[in-house]
UniProtKB/Swiss-Prot annotation:
One MF annotation (Gene Ontology) recorded for this entry: identical protein binding
Domain of life per record: Eukaryota
InterPro entries: TAF1D
Gene Ontology biological-process annotations: regulation of DNA-templated transcription
Binding partners and assembly: Component of the transcription factor SL1/TIF-IB complex, composed of TBP and at least TAF1A, TAF1B, TAF1C and TAF1D. Interacts with UBTF.
PTM-bearing positions, type Phosphoserine: 20, 132, 229
Classification via PANTHER family: TATA BOX-BINDING PROTEIN ASSOCIATED FACTOR RNA POLYMERASE I SUBUNIT D (PTHR14562), TATA BOX-BINDING PROTEIN-ASSOCIATED FACTOR RNA POLYMERASE I SUBUNIT D (PTHR14562:SF3)
Subcellular location: Nucleus
Protein name: TATA box-binding protein-associated factor RNA polymerase I subunit D
Region (Disordered): 1-45, 84-111
Length: 274
């Protein structure tokens, strides 16, 4: 209600100023001076008091009745107001750059081709213990990779060992067993079992089993001690297969010669008989 009264008072003040200007100018049809319109103050926190009404409805309501009270605020009206206030983002138009689309022509460049020999020599990892094998030649990439992986593996294994030793010391201190740290090495302590000092669950042997074991000792056995010479294999080894094949080849050659001779002799006899 206060805002409506303020707007009506501003409109009446503007009309009185216009009338005074017209009377001073006389019967002139044109206005020589523009009346400065006072700037309207922004209404803050109007959402809580009034419902936002679009321009078309405002014109109809102001023409019909100015004494109508505003409607109560609802959630639907709030959402509609914020939807109308959302600014539409401008769509970015495609600007052609002139570059070719897709993969560029030519051979694909690799990182190895970009590295120079000087950079490779400066940054190459050194393994001096391999000079006896390769000499002063540079190592291939595969060997460098395998040795680097081995170095990293050894480093992480050493870290694991240090971590184990640290936690072992702390646990022994909590158990008040600090003397064992001085006597035993940590590597030997690592593979130590719980039943070193004594069995966890001792098993008692029965009397029947003890009697059977004593009887077996007194009984005679058929086992005899034998010298080692009985277990030595004879020195006669079979001939190799290659020799067998050679003998077969020689035999086939001899048979072929005999067959040729017999065939020739048969032909010679037949010619004479004819």
């Amino acid at each position: 209600m206060d805002s409506l009264n303020y707007t009506t008072a501003c409109d009446s003040a503007v009309e009185t100023e216009n009338q005074s200007d017209n009377s001073s100018s006389g019967s002139s049809l044109f206005k020589t001076q523009c009346v400065p319109v006072p700037p309207k103050r922004r209404q803050r926190n109007t959402i809580r008091k009034f419902v936002h009404i679009p321009k078309n409805t405002q014109a109809t309501e102001s023409s019909s009745d100015s004494s109508i009270e505003p409607r109560p605020l609802t959630l639907k009206a709030i959402f509609e107001r914020f939807k109308n206030k959302k600014r539409k983002r401008k769509k970015k138009k495609y600007k052609p750059t002139g570059r070719s689309v897709g993969r560029p022509k030519g051979r694909r460049t690799t990182r190895y081709s970009q590295i120079t020999e000087k950079q490779f020599k400066d940054k190459r990892p050194g393994f001096p213990f391999l000079e006896s094998e390769n000499g002063r030649k540079p190592l291939p990439w595969r060997k460098i990779l395998t040795f680097e992986q081995a170095v990293a593996r050894g480093f992480f294994n050493y870290l694991e060992k240090l971590k184990y030793e640290y936690y072992l010391k702390e646990s022994l201190k909590q158990m008040n067993v600090a003397e064992d740290l001085e006597k035993d090495d940590l590597d030997s302590r690592r593979y130590r079992y719980l039943d070193d000092d004594g069995s966890l669950s001792p098993i008692e042997e029965s009397a029947a089993e003890e009697e059977t074991a004593a009887n077996l000792e007194h009984d005679e056995c058929d086992i005899k001690l034998v010298e080692n010479s009985y277990f030595i294999i004879s020195s006669e080894f079979p001939k190799k297969k290659q020799n067998v094949h050679l003998d077969q080849e020689e035999y086939t050659e001899e048979t072929a010669l005999l067959k040729k001779r017999t065939s020739k002799s048969k032909h010679w006899i037949e010619d004479k008989m004819a």
